[in-house]
Amino acid sequence: MIISRPLCGFVFAGLSFAVILPAQALVAADNQAARAEIRRTGFGVPHIVAANERGLGYGIGYAYAQDNLCLLANEVVTVNGERSRYFGPDKATLEQRSNMASDLLFKWLNTPEALADFWKAQPPEIRQLMQGYVAGYNRSLDEQKTKGLPRPCAADWVRPISTDDLLRLTRRLLVEGGVGQFTEAFAGAKPPSAQKPLQVDSQQVQALQLAAVRNQRFALERGSNAVAVGHELSANGRGMLLANPHFPWGGGMRFYQMHLTIPGKLDVMGAALPGLPLINIGFNRHLAWSHTVDTSKHFTLHRLQLDPKDSTRYLLDGKSIAMGQQQVSVEVKQPDGSLKDVPRIIYSSKFGPVVQWPGKLDWDDKFAFSLRDANLENDRVLQQWYSMDKADSLKAFQDSLHKIQGIPWVNTLAVDAKGQALYMNLSVVPNVDAAKLAKCSDPRIGTELIVLDGSRSECNWDISAEAAQAGIYPSSRQPQLLRSDFVQHSNDSAWMVNPAAPLKGFSPLISQDGQPLGQRARFALDRLGSLQQAGKVSAENLQAMVMDNEVYQAGQVLPDLLKFCASELGDDVARLTPLCAALKAWDGRADLNSGIGFVYFQRIMTSMQGVASRWRVVFDPQNPIHTPSGLAIENPQVASALRAAMLAAVDEVAKAGLSPESKWGDIQVSSLSGKPIPIHGGPAGLGVYNAMQTIAGKDGKREVVSGTSYLQVVTFDEQGPRAQGLLAFSESSNPQSAHSSDQTEAFSKKQWSELPFTEQQIKADPAYQVQVISEEGSR
């Protein structure tokens, strides 16, 4: 039973009254039933207190299921490879992958043997957290079944979960930066037939084309911004952090906000991904941190030289080796509702599974391609985040990343109360240096996709005794920077984290220097430079970096667009005058009240991306913040392309049914709760720090699917952390919940909230409610 503040001294447990005990008394011994206290504050955020890990996990699983039962149940179906069984093979996942391809990947990835090995590698604390989570989730499921499951998941695919399900979810997270990007290429890999030439149906071609786009946009769609400000630059002389991860607003990568406490051992608040009984991004009494998706490589492809006598054998150092053949069977729902087992052979080399991408990674009589994912051997990820959660100093925090090396595919930025700002690119990266890359890869391919020679053992990953895992870089050879002014990151390489101390000379698989920066990084460095010149940086300054919604690229090219409008319209003046008027009236932002000029600007710049000569000032590695810039409208080729882009933009806006009076808030919305809520922000590629990814909706609207998610600005004073934050898509994914849209409304209005952290702050919250649960009480 949940009770509010006036009654917080007592709860009902069955028919008896029970005093709410201090957390130390919630569990008397490890072998007794788990108990947890769940205190909810504004927006339904749970503050969970328990005496040990099992009790804490119990509270996390219970609270999460209260808010997101359907979401997690659906993800459990996915990672078990059962989507074709329940929904049919031709339907698509939330990520627009075919159910069949997804099922094949997860049946292969999450074998009983792999799960057993992963579980065996977990420390007792992690096992207890997961066991408690399972018990808490299943208790909430039982309670909700009694009342009636939420409509979206009132179906037979919702079931109690096990610790194996949590392991499956974790392993899915690990391969997001590797083999998970090759789902279609993995599922479609078949040896060439001797009887007929390689044939690929149109549906597979389309799926692979979509996969190629996803692969290229991985860092964008799983992107982030983060700024860590040190004592030299912060307004109060202490550490200050902005966390602005850009993650999906639904599915298995949707953040959940919570506060976890084991008195005397753990006190951490922030956000976590589904199924994880710990905090991924957050703060504790001593420090605050965030992550940004890195540009490092977390897998390599290996070109196999095939045995001329058998295309399922490959040559390694001149010796013929048979590919491994693993049969995977997927249950598939038939049109009549019956189930049929569909078997598939997954081929692999010593490096990993064979993948086939027609026209890119062909499996023919001469060659095939095998993928080695470094994170497949990373069983340290949960231990890593839990160690970070417990860190009582920045040194302890940094040491844990050096020792455990469990971060899969993100950078880490952190500050402490003393005002030290730290950047670490310490993720799991294959140990392949520039010399080996030059010797073992085809230079024509470049470094976007690393393809090594799979016919020579010397081209395999190097082994370092310092590394936590065979074949990856030791942390001592990866980028890191400790500053007293600032470090920042927005999904570029590590080299311009702080222009005063460029990070150079690393393996191309880790970080490449001298490369153009993305528009968000240029915006951040420009803004921080201006603030640095003006004096100090405040928490309000960091909030404004996100919330003022400046379109940074507009400052570089809008004057040229308006100049073109004034003198180059020619015979198209009648058609283009409304567009030019809208551009002139536009405020250069992605705010709710920004005019239709922003829509025109987006369409124009999207069209111009393919024009190589569009920049008047090309990229200069000596001036990466301010180059490239300016549209070269004096170039006839650029002028012609610009005219075509403008005309196309006019047609597209008209087709969408938008009027000259349309505002950005009328167009970009979130309808997750069932009603459209206006959402500010815009495309990351235009330099909008408050990045949003959208898909086409009804009536010309754009529906947000990814972008700014969990926001926090953390500062410190004598009492500890002071934090403000928001969860842009709200705490619950259940449209019927009171907390399915409340924070989304607040985000729309740019209303940050104080995040209650201390006991006094939590209990003083106007929405304070408390619930005590125990395994004994659920029997």
From Swiss-Prot:
Disulfide bonds: none annotated. AHL-mediated signaling mediates quorum sensing in many species of Proteobacteria, regulating hundreds of genes, including many that code for extracellular virulence factors. Residues 1-25 form the signal peptide. Gene3D superfamilies: 1.10.1400.10, 2.30.120.10, Glutamine Phosphoribosylpyrophosphate, subunit 1, domain 1, Penicillin Amidohydrolase, domain 1. Catalyzes the deacylation of acyl-homoserine lactone (AHL or acyl-HSL), releasing homoserine lactone (HSL) and the corresponding fatty acid. Possesses a specificity for the degradation of long-chain acyl-HSLs (side chains of 11 to 14 carbons in length). It comes from Pseudomonas savastanoi pv. phaseolicola (strain 1448A / Race 6) (Pseudomonas syringae pv. phaseolicola (strain 1448A / Race 6)). Pfam families: Penicil_amidase. It is an enzyme of class 3 (hydrolase). Residues 731-752 are annotated as: Disordered. Residues 202-223 form a propeptide. Its main location: periplasm. It catalyses: an N-acyl-L-homoserine lactone + H2O = L-homoserine lactone + a carboxylate. Belongs to the peptidase S45 family. The active site is at 224 (nucleophile). This is Acyl-homoserine lactone acylase PvdQ. The keyword Hydrolase applies. Residues 731-746 have a biased composition (Polar residues). It is found in: Periplasm. Heterodimer of an alpha subunit and a beta subunit processed from the same precursor.
